[in-house]
Amino acid sequence: MRRPHFDVRSSRWILTLFLVCAIAFAGCGGDESGDEAAGDAPDADDVAITIEEGDRSPAITGAAARFTSPENGAVLESGADVMVTVDVDSFEAGIQTETPRADAIANSENGQHVHIIVDGGPYYANYEPGSPFDVGMLPDGAHSAIVFPSRSYHESVKNAGAMDFVNFYVGEEAGTFPFDPDRPTIIYSRPKGLYTGVAAERIMLDFYLHNVALSEDGYTARYQIREEGGDEVLASTTLHEWTPSFVEGLPDGTYEIRLELLAADGNVVPG
C-alpha cells in the first residue's frame, strides 16, 4: 500500500503539507495479504472520482474559540517549545457531535475539539481547551496561529466570529507574519491523516474563510485532486458557497489536493 502526501496550496498561503493519507478499502486484509490486496486495487484511471458539494452541519450557536496566550505581538523564547492556550465559548470539547454525518465519515472517538493551525501547516487537534497546548519548537522569527472549533468529524464551525488568530515572534522581532488579517484568506483544514476501511469511501474536504465570502459572481474556492507528482487533474470542483465537500471513488494511492481562492475574473488570489 502506498502512503501518500497531500500537497496543499492555499491562495493566501502557498504551502506544502506532508500529510500521510493512505486510501484503503475494507477487505484489504491484514499485514500478510496487504501488499497483494493493494496491488489488486483499481487504478485512478479505472474509477470515477467525484467531488460532491455538501451541506453544512447544523449550527452550534455562539460557538467560538480564542487564544488567551501568547498575546498578539509577543516575543517568545528561542529554542523552546511554543505553548498556546485556547478558550472556547458555547462549545463543549470531548463529546461526540450528534448528527448522521458522524456515522458517515471519519469521526474522532475523542469528540469535539479545536483545530490549531500554525504557519499554514497541518492542524493540531486540541481536545482540552483551557490548558496549555504544545505546538512544538519553531524557528526564530515571525509566526501566525489560527484556531476554530471543530465537530468530532472535523467539520469546522463556521459561525461569524468563531475563528481567532495570534501573530507572534520567536527569539526576535523579525520577518513578516504569514497571516494578514486584512486580506481575503482561505485556510486548508481537511483531509488529513490515515484513511482506511469505511472512512476511506467518503472523504470530507473542508476549509475556513477569513475576510471573504464566496458567491456566484465574486470569490470562489477551487479544489483539484492529482496523484502524487502527477500533472493530470483527476477531479475538480469550484464552490460558490462555504460548505464542506465529499470525495468518493479514490482507489489506493497517494494524492495531492490543491485548494485555491479565485477572484471574480477566475484568477488565483495572490498570497
Regions found by a protein language model. Name each.
Residues 45-79, 169-198:
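Short, compositionally biased P/S/T/A/G/V-rich stretches that sit at domain boundaries
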Residues 81-88:
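Beta-strand cores of secreted/periplasmic/IMS beta-sandwich domains, seen most often
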Residues 24-27:
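C-terminal motif of bacterial Sec signal peptides marking the signal peptidase cleavage site
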Residues 16-21:
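Sec-dependent N-terminal signal peptides
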Residues 2-15:
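Bacterial N-terminal signal peptides that target proteins for export
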Residues 51-58, 89, 93-172, 192-271:
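Long, low-complexity serine/threonine/glycine- and acidic-rich segments characteristic of extracellular
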Residues 37-38:
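Intrinsically disordered, low-complexity segments enriched in small/polar and acidic residues
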Residues 29-32:
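Bacterial signal peptide processing site
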